[in-house]
Structure formats: C-alpha cells, structure tokens
Amino acid sequence: MFRTMSIARLLLVLALTPLAALAESPPQGSLVIIGGALRADNAAVWQRVVQLAGGAGARIAVLPGAAGNPERSGATLVRYLNQYGASAFVVPLAVRLKGRDYRRDAEDEALARSIRQSGGVYFTGGDQALITQALVRPDGSRTAALEAIWDVYRRGGVIAGSSAGAAIMSSTMYYDAKTVFGTLSQGVRDGIELTPGLGFIGSDVFVDQHLLARGRFARMLPAMLKKGYKTGLGIDENTAMVIGPQREVEVIGYQGALLVDLTQASSDPANKEFNLSNARISYLDQGDRYNLVTRRYTPSADKAEGKVDPAKPYMAEPVYSADILGHNAALVMMTNLIDNAQAEAIGIAAAAPGEPRQDLGFQFKFSRAPDTTGYASERSEAYTILGMRLDVTPLHIVRPWYSDWK
C-alpha cells in the first residue's frame, strides 16, 4: 500500500512540476530570429511563426518590452500576427509601460501562466537591454515570466524575435554599442558594450541583426573574439533564420544571413589594434539550410544544380569598396568575387567625420580559399557563398583623403 501510494505521489509531483525543473533536457521548440525591419507583407516569416506556434488560432504571447512605446508596438504586432491566423495577445510586462511595476509583473503567476499556456512567444524590436532588465532578476536568475518563456520553448513552442528580439537569442548580446567602426577601433568590454542575453540558441553561437544593411558583420568579429565564440550567425533585415531542435538553420524571407566561422582564425596580440587572420565567412541565401551540429550545408532547390565552376569565372573585374561597412557592401563584394577571375577583393573601413581615431582604418581582404564554394540560383542573380576567407588588418589613414582637382 505504501509503495503504491509513493509511486502515485511521485507521478503526481512530476505532473505538477513546472517544465522549468526539467531544464536538463534540450528544448524541443524552434527559434525564428528576425533581422529587424520586418514588413507586414512578408508572409513567409509571419506564417512560419504562426505555424510553429500551432497553426491557425495559435496563442502567441507578444512581449513589447524593448519598444519605446510598448502599448503601440504590442498592439501592432498582435494585429500582424492575427492577420496571419494567430490568436496573439500582449503581455503587459515592460520597463516603460506606464502605471505598472515591471518587477512585480515579471513575478506574477497569472501573467506567467498566460505565457506558459501559449504556443509561442514574440519579442518586439527596440532596446534589447530593456528585455533583459524586465525578465532577469538583479542577481542574474530568471523571473517567473522568463521561466514560463523557457517552458514554452522546451515543450516544443516557438520563440521569435525581431531586431532587439533577435539580439537576446544568444548568451551574449550587444548592449551600449558604439558605431561599427567605433567597435573595431575602440574594442568591446564586458558589462558595457557586451552583456548577457537570454541564450535561447545556446552558449556556442553568437547572434547579431540588421547585419548587411548596417555593416554589422564587422562588429561580430571583436565580440566573438572577446567571448571565445567560434560560430556566429548574423541575420539581415526583413529576413529570418528558423532554427529547429536539430539545430538546423533555414533562411526565409527577403535576403539572407551570414555565418561567421572563427575555428581556424587567429589574432596577433602584439598588434594593439584589432586584427584577424583566416576567418571564414559564408552567405546563406533564402531557402538555404545549414546544420550547426553536422556543419552540413543544403542549398535551396533553385541552387542545387548551380555550383560555381572556378575554372569558368563569369567576371574578371577587380573588386574594391571604399566603404565596406556601408549598406550591403560586404554582400556585394562577396557576390562579385565568388564567380570572378580575381582571387581577392579589398574593402576599406575608416572613421566618419567627427568620429574618434581619424588616423585609423581597417582593410578587409576577402579571398577564395581552396575549399570556398559558390552556388548560383537558376531563377535569379542570387548566390550562396560558403567558406570565403576574411583577413582584417589595421591601416594608417592620411587625412584628407582627397582635395579639389586642379
């Protein structure tokens, strides 16, 4: 009798135990990491979020805490998600939400229960520091609300986030970041430029966003070196990476993502300025897949038969950029080099007028390594680029760069 009651009691305890207590088991859910500036008509991304949350009528908890105006941002996101078939609702938890105590809200059991009963969670854009401020206790432990979010993820739900909501996906995130050039020229510090994220993707992958549009691929490099990351994923605007429980990355939406591999990279500590040798950088286009565990790449259907033949280059012109940190400059350079008779391409980064370190610049040298591979789409001019080498070296910049022609 005693044994029977003990087993029954154990089963009852297990049934009533929050999923947070089962933290040792890997999450069974998915991540949708969006690079910001997600358009309302980007059906591929919105529909995938709803699908992964459970399909038509799925409950999705919207956390607008990063936004400058949480009420307006939350209402907008709920409207978009519901247009694509969800049953979304705003979670009233935000540092800037007027008339509320975010510390109390983060520990409210009814609020946590509403999150836990959802099939998905969506973090809006804005300031990622406000997300962690609201969800993480001062001692670094998880609030009840954050545990509920993890419960959704563990049991198979989706965690989605755009811009700031993407930044919190890794265990380290940019916080009070300088410009991209300022980050290269002045470095990064723990607790100032870099702070802990929420870590949904795991401790081994660094995530950044607005990547190609704002030249942020370059700021991934010092952050990854500082924190010891070997793998980084950067997602561009109006585009998303979907990462399932098998850790396979699928790119959907408007453009693509960059995969940064520092496995064989090195930096010369004798040079006080930022420098990096033998990094590998890949561009994953929409429809492409990459498995973070097996490191296997699967091209989209329109590129499966389009492997670039380096013996038959399409272009022969030199490739150069005087502003490698500019809008889409890195992607343009990589695309123009992968199917080119030229072996390397050079991009220059320098301080903007009024920015510190006017005498300093950086050369970004992209080159094709023996194992660099490209795939061309049969439907568009898009390419996928795998394993292009990147070396970054400091330069001395002479001012002014130019004068009137006489």
Language-model segment annotations:
Residues 24-57, 62, 67, 71-75, ...:
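C-terminal and late-domain segments of enzyme folds
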Residues 128-142:
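Glycine/threonine-rich flexible loop motifs
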Residues 101-111:
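Glycine-rich, highly charged phosphate/nucleotide-binding loops
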Residues 1-6:
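N-terminal secretory signal peptides that target proteins for export/translocation
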Residues 118:
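An anion/phosphate-binding loop that grips the pyrophosphate of nucleotide cofactors and donors
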Residues 122-125, 148-149, 153-174:
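Catalytic nucleophile loop
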Residues 110-114, 141-156:
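Catalytic-core regions built around general acid/base machinery
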Residues 8-19:
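Bacterial N-terminal signal peptides
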